[in-house]
Curated annotation (Swiss-Prot):
It catalyses: FMNH2 + NADP(+) = FMN + NADPH + 2 H(+). Keywords: Flavoprotein, FMN, Luminescence, NADP, Oxidoreductase. The keyword Oxidoreductase applies. GO terms for biological process: bioluminescence. FMN binds at residues 11-15, 39, 67-69, 128-131, 167-169. Catalyzes the NADPH-dependent reduction of FMN to FMNH(2). Involved in bioluminescence by providing FMNH(2) to luciferase. Belongs to the flavin oxidoreductase frp family. It comes from Vibrio harveyi. CDD domains: NfsA-like (cd02146). SUPFAM superfamilies: FMN-dependent nitroreductase-like. InterPro entries: Flavin_OxRdtase_Frp (IPR016446), Nitroreductase (IPR029479), Nitroreductase-like (IPR000415). Its EC number is 1.5.1.38. This is NADPH-flavin oxidoreductase. Homodimer.
Length: 240
């Protein structure tokens, strides 16, 4: 197993950081790794807003659900769909197709994971902040995003000040299907629930008595940010 694979498999979300800054060289390398990511049809429809202003960091932390590490991380990056670049080049660009919004979301995720993997390869850590979408319009206004662009998620990066366990994932045979979709075997989920129950009960922080099935059922039982589609539409995206 090479160093790249070891780094990927050792991924943990880091939510507590030291006060040590990320160097300019490290930051530039992380960004270059992101820019090297695959891009659908070479459209390059992602923009990153690096937030260094402490007041804006404080507001973003509140918008994300009072996640203090948005303020304390050495770096905070916000990943956005961006077709305004293209509309500036050619005003006839039709950015309102849902397909283009999906491309922007997919490419943003690919770019962000490249950034995070590059950071982790340097001994840094990070965590995604999807909670920005709780207040997408307010975040959008704070960052001054133009038409044809939209906020997707944030990313905290810094030197880890914690050493959490690696969270067990679903087994590959549950996730990977051969030739066609296979019906779920609930015995596999029951076994995984036992694994996750042991993990939740024994991890070093935020211990709880729960299973994966209970967690995802609670998460998916109600509405999930119903304001997102109107927000995207208001930015000229995902209209048709």
């Amino acid at each position: 197993m090479n160093n790249t694979i070891e780094t990927i498999l050792a991924h943990r979300s880091i939510r507590k950081f030291t006060a040590v800054p990320i160097t300019d060289e490290q930051r530039q390398t992380i960004i270059q790794a992101g820019l090297a990511a695959s891009s659908s049809s070479m459209l390059q429809v992602v923009s990153i807003v690096r937030v260094t202003d402490s007041e804006k960091r404080n507001e973003l932390a509140q918008f994300a659900g009072n996640q203090a590490y948005v303020e304390s991380a050495a770096e905070f990056l916000v990943f956005c769909i961006d077709y305004q670049r293209h509309a500036t080049i050619n005003p006839d660009v039709q950015a309102d197709f849902t397909e283009l919004t999906l491309i922007g979301a997919v490419d943003s995720g690919i770019m962000a994971q490249n950034c995070l993997l590059a950071a982790e390869s340097m001994g840094l850590g990070g965590v995604y902040i999807g909670g920005l979408r709780n207040s997408a319009a307010q975040v959008d206004e704070l960052l001054g995003l133009p038409e044809n662009s939209a906020v997707l998620f944030g990313m905290c990066l810094g030197h880890p000040d914690q050493n959490p366990e690696v969270k067990p994932r679903l087994p590959a045979h549950v996730v990977v299907h051969e030739n066609q979709y296979q019906e779920l075997n609930l015995d596999d989920i029951q076994s995984y629930d036992q694994t996750m129950q042991a993990y939740y009960a024994s991890r070093t922080s935020n211990q709880k008595l729960s299973t994966w099935s209970q967690e995802v059922t609670g998460k998916l039982a109600g509405e999930s940010r119903p304001h997102i589609l109107p927000y995207l539409n208001s930015k000229g995206l995902a209209k048709r």
